Design a protein with these regions (language model features):
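Beta-propeller blade repeat segments, especially FG-GAP/WD-type strand-to-loop junctions
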Residues: 138-156, 188-190
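Short glycine/acidic-enriched loop and turn motifs that connect beta-strands
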Residues: 131-135, 179-180
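C-terminal motif of bacterial Sec signal peptides marking the signal peptidase cleavage site
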Residues: 4-5
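Beta-propeller fold detector
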Residues: 154-159, 198-202
Length: 271
């Protein structure tokens, strides 16, 4: 499975990558292969009970199942680096913060679903958390999104403080924070020709200067967002703080229920 799915057809993409917030997670450029050394309960194809999308993404779903199985069991097979660094899996899926001390039920609390994010007739694979009060898939949150381009490819992934939500209006929204004074809300179109498959549409972000003056800025348009120098104050972009935060609240409340299946269900289908 290769990672590094989406690219930009313009030079500004590199500018965007260099100006991400500290929490933003880039896509690792590595190649990994399915570990078939041990039977972890999934991997033997039972295609008759699997959907077309589950068959299409089976290679990456198998890898996530293996990682989650090992983590939940607490076996010697569980090694964060083995799955996150060597195989390039999304850390918030195989190693969520709420499982650090108690991984019981991990296979039932991590889920996946399929959704056509750009209307091209092919569904993407979305992975995230099931249930709970913090960023569940039922509220539209996804911590990893894969596309198909001959094989499954990781488009983008989130973190606990850099979260992606699939809006009911077809947009992808990101909410991020690197402290009380630095927050962002960003609106994207899902577009495979852009870096991380995300075309910037609209951005709200907060800043604070050395004199503790705090403000929000609002930027519209991919060219303007990607060329932005975020450590500077731009008077033309400054907006009312209440307006910025209220808009961010509306965006992050617009998630569509992704109706996830968990990995126990996946294992049963795989046989």
């Amino acid at each position: 499975i290769s990672f590094g799915a989406c690219s930009a057809n313009n030079a500004a993409a590199e500018t965007e990558a260099s100006q991400q917030t500290p929490e933003a997670t880039s896509t690792p450029d590595v190649t990994v292969e399915l570990d078939t050394s041990e039977d972890k309960g999934a991997g033997k194809s039972n295609a008759g009970s699997m959907s077309v999308d589950e068959q299409r993404y089976a290679s990456v779903l198998d890898l996530y199942y293996q990682a989650l199985y090992a983590h939940q069991a607490g076996t010697a097979d569980w090694d964060r680096d083995k799955y996150v660094v060597e195989r390039g899996l999304a850390e918030c899926i195989v190693n969520p913060y709420w499982a650090w001390e108690n991984s019981d039920g991990l296979l039932s609390r991590i889920g996946y679903s399929f959704r056509d994010l750009n209307g091209d007739g092919t569904n993407e694979l979305l992975l995230g958390w099931i249930g709970g009060d913090f960023c569940p898939m039922e509220d539209g949150y996804a911590f990893a999104v894969y596309i198909i381009n001959g094989q499954p490819l990781l488009a983008f992934q989130g973190q606990e403080r850099d979260r992606f939500l699939i809006g009911d209006d077809g947009y992808v929204y990101r909410s991020g924070s690197s402290g009380a004074a630095y927050s962002e809300y960003e609106k994207y179109r899902f577009h495979p020709e852009w870096q991380y498959c995300l075309e910037p549409v609209e951005l709200f972000y907060s800043q604070i200067d050395e004199d503790n003056h705090f403000w929000w800025e609002h930027v519209v348009g991919a060219e303007q967002i990607m060329g932005l120098q975020r450590l500077e104050r731009h008077e033309e972009y400054v907006v009312d703080s209440d307006f910025a935060m209220e808009t961010g609240k509306i965006w992050t409340s617009s998630g569509v229920n992704l109706r996830p299946s968990n990995f126990l269900v996946y294992a049963a289908k795989r046989g």
